[in-house]
Regions:
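Soluble ligand-binding/transfer domains with enclosed cavities or grooves
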Residues: 1-225
Length: 225
């Protein structure tokens, strides 16, 4: 599955429809924690999204899949983040990727109401880094905790994200995403593995994410390539 996460979105969607849906249906039937209220304690921690059809993850080119994370806190804060290796010109790509990296985080809040998960996007964090060491799970968690503290200090009065540092095309895409509250459903969840279905509107195509707790990446090897 890790090898397939870098494929084009349309190809991943087709793969899900033709190959993965029987697996998803079977996992859903075997879900040991089908009630959303039982799932809250299970999600807390750092997860690696090893495969996903969520469109916004690859709005920027060059996402490093091994340095992509989902992090949940017990206080209701949640983040999707990743490191990106910019630079697409053949002569400069290798040089730039070795020196510079771009880290991007979407800060979110989650809650369970009437046995349903709801996700609200509340901010973004971003920055260029010297690409001398990877964005490890420990660094990702520290960055997330710092972002949460900044958000708590601001309070709930201002939850409008700052898109000024993004190019106009990307900013428009994220503005549209931020306007909606996503519904999230764990088709399957245990302490180390999550199969998640997300949808922002009833008429929208649902997205699927396979995530494993960062220390347990061997749990998806049974899914066919």
């Amino acid at each position: 599955m890790h090898d397939r996460d870098g494929e084009a979105l349309g190809k991943k969607v087709a793969f899900a429809k033709t190959e993965l849906m029987p697996w998803f249906d079977e996992l859903s039937r075997r879900n040991p924690f089908p009630n959303a209220s039982e799932q809250i304690d299970l999600v807390v921690g750092v997860w690696s999204p090893v495969w996903s059809t969520i469109p916004f993850q690859d709005i920027f080119p060059g996402r490093i899949h091994e340095q992509s994370y989902q992090i949940f806190q017990a206080n209701g804060y949640y983040a999707n983040m990743a490191r990106y290796a910019p630079g697409k010109l053949p002569l400069l790509k290798q040089f730039i990727e070795k020196l510079v990296a771009y880290d991007f985080m979407i800060l979110q809040k989650f809650e369970v109401r009437s046995e349903q998960w709801f996700i609200q996007n509340i901010g973004i964090q971003q920055g260029f880094r010297l690409n001398l060491s990877p964005l490890s799970s420990e660094k990702a968690q520290a960055w997330f905790e710092s972002a949460v503290q900044k958000q708590l200090a601001k309070g709930e009065a201002n939850t409008t994200p700052d898109f000024q540092k993004l190019d106009r095309s990307t900013a428009k895409k994220y503005e549209k995403i931020f306007q909606a509250t996503a519904q999230l459903q764990h088709l399957y969840i245990d302490r180390d593995f999550r199969l998640v279905k997300t949808q922002r509107a009833a008429k929208q195509r649902p997205s699927y994410t396979i995530a494993v707790r960062k220390a347990s990446t061997n749990l998806i090897t049974g899914i066919s390539n």
